[in-house]
């Protein structure tokens, strides 16, 4: 009975294919898609019987279909001993994950606290404070640059004063030396 319904489904699919190829009321004449499919099947059979590589490929296609079957994994199920070895090999990792999950579980009440729930209410205030902070950072940069310029001016002035004092000291030494020489002439 099931074979009959499969045959009917196949025949319906071939008729639908003929409608696609020839159109809904197409002039197909005596030509049928099934005849063309049979010819293709015979040609492929002839080719495969002549070529050894094609025979090997046909055998591999059957294996590939078998391996792609989702139930294949269930048929070659892993023994319980192997599953146990997998679990034991990952024991330390599993225990560390359990400890982390317990920590998260312990911290859940803190996430539900009133302080965390009030965060959206404080968002506008936080944004205003962030803007003030940015303005203060800009002011700080300006003050730093002004201070740097003032320090450079101070250093230049100090350097010039030092040079001037050195020149005055040299001039004073020369004048003192000249005054000491004159009293010896008397």
UniProtKB/Swiss-Prot annotation:
Domain of life: Eukaryota
UniProtKB keywords: Acetylation, Cell cycle, Cell division, Centromere, Chromosome, Coiled coil, Cytoplasm, Cytoskeleton, Kinetochore, Mitosis
Coiled-coil segments: 135-157
Location, primary (coarse class): cytoplasm
Residues recorded as bearing N-acetylalanine in the entry: 2
GO CC entries: centrosome; cleavage furrow; cytosol; dynactin complex; kinetochore; midbody; nucleolus; perinuclear region of cytoplasm
Subcellular location: Cytoplasm; Cytoplasm, Cytoskeleton, Microtubule organizing center, Centrosome; Chromosome, Centromere, Kinetochore; Cytoplasm, Cytoskeleton, Spindle
UniProt xrefs under InterPro entries: DCTN3
Tissue specificity as recorded in UniProt: Ubiquitously expressed. Highly expressed in muscle and pancreas and detected at lower levels in brain.
Statement: the UniProt record of this protein carries the keyword Ribonucleoprotein: no
One of the protein's GO biological processes: microtubule-based process
Record Pfam families: Dynactin_p22
Subunit structure: Subunit of dynactin, a multiprotein complex part of a tripartite complex with dynein and a adapter, such as BICDL1, BICD2 or HOOK3. The dynactin complex is built around ACTR1A/ACTB filament and consists of an actin-related filament composed of a shoulder domain, a pointed end and a barbed end. Its length is defined by its flexible shoulder domain. The soulder is composed of 2 DCTN1 subunits, 4 DCTN2 and 2 DCTN3. The 4 DCNT2 (via N-terminus) bind the ACTR1A filament and act as molecular rulers to determine the length. The pointed end is important for binding dynein-dynactin cargo adapters.
Assigned protein family: Belongs to the dynactin subunit 3 family.
Functional note: Part of the dynactin complex that activates the molecular motor dynein for ultra-processive transport along microtubules. Together with dynein may be involved in spindle assembly and cytokinesis.
Protein name: Dynactin subunit 3
The gene coding this protein: DCTN3
């Amino acid at each position: 009975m099931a074979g009959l319904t499969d045959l009917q489904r196949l025949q319906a699919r071939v008729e639908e294919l003929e409608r696609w190829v020839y159109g809904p009321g197409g002039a197909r004449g005596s030509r049928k898609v099934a005849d063309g499919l049979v010819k293709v099947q015979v040609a492929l059979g002839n080719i495969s019987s002549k070529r050894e590589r094609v025979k090997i490929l046909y055998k591999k296609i059957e294996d590939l279909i078998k391996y792609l079957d989702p139930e294949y994994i269930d048929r070659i199920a892993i023994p319980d001993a192997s599953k146990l070895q997998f679990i034991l090999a990952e024991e330390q990792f599993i225990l560390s994950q359990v400890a982390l999950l317990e920590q998260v579980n312990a911290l859940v009440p803190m996430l539900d606290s009133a302080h965390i729930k009030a965060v959206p209410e404080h968002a506008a205030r936080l944004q205003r404070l962030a803007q003030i902070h940015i303005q203060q950072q800009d002011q700080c940069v300006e003050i730093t640059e002004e201070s740097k310029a003032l320090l450079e001016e101070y250093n230049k002035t100090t350097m010039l004063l030092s040079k001037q004092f050195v020149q005055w000291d040299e001039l004073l030494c020369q004048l003192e030396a000249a005054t000491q020489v004159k009293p010896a002439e008397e």
